[in-house]
A protein has these predicted regions:
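N-terminal secretory signal peptides that target proteins for export/translocation
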Residues: 1-8
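Bacterial N-terminal signal peptides
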Residues: 12-24
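Acidic/histidine-rich alpha-helical segments that form the ligand environment
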Residues: 125-158, 168
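Short, contiguous alpha-helical
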Residues: 38-40, 46-66, 74-123, 158-198
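Boundary of Sec targeting at the N-terminus
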Residues: 27-28
């Protein structure tokens, strides 16, 4: 019985210490400045979209990744030392960009309540790239990103809650493939490290 009382006192003492430490930490934390106001769902999604589209922060955005590429460079596919397509980098920057445009346009359509057709296979979202339309493709990529950002900006809160995970996933998808574009450009020798990635 005496052991139980000692355990209760130790437990109570630990709770008091925990509460005291928590209050002390909170009291020492400065109030956020106006630029550090808490994020809303909308502002967090817009920040994600911009960081993968046109705002260099943690990584190189897609607009920078495709800037300055010629149509000829955009169709280049890495080959291994035997002259075969490298299985670790089997897409050109153009194919990767076409894939990004396809899926971002698909997501935009769904956000607008449309029912865009899904591809028969994901391969066709890469393989339908035509180097003759490279400049148009780069413009479409920029425009679809602006359109998605505008939709998120104006969307009612209840609808935004329904599409939030899709918007977050397309941002992650964009960052992933932008990294691949940079990898291919580095292999090709067409990437300028001054643009963000050494």
């Amino acid at each position: 019985m005496a052991t139980m009382r000692v355990m209760h006192r130790v437990f109570a003492f630990n709770i008091v210490l925990l509460v005291t430490a928590s209050v002390t930490l909170v009291a020492q934390t400065p109030s956020p400045s106006p630029s550090e106001t808490p994020a809303t769902l909308r502002s967090a999604l817009l920040a994600e979209l911009h960081s993968t589209h046109d705002k260099a922060e943690w990584f190189t955005p897609m607009n920078t990744a495709v800037a300055g590429l010629t149509a000829e460079q955009a169709k280049w596919i890495p080959h291994n030392s035997q002259g075969k397509v490298d299985q670790n980098a089997n897409h050109s920057t153009g194919m990767l960009t076409h894939h990004l445009v396809f899926w971002n346009e698909n997501v935009l359509g769904r956000m607008r309540g449309e029912k865009p057709a899904d591809p028969k296979t994901n391969d066709e979202t890469f393989n339908d790239f035509d180097a003759a339309h490279w400049n148009d493709l780069v413009q479409r990529l920029d425009q679809v990103m602006k359109n998605i950002e505008a939709e998120v900006e104006k969307m009612p809160e209840e609808k935004l809650l329904k599409v939030a995970s899709t918007v977050s996933h397309i941002s992650t998808h964009n960052a992933y493939h932008t990294g691949q574009i940079l990898y291919v450009r580095k292999l090709q020798g067409s990437w300028n490290p001054a643009n963000g990635v050494k």
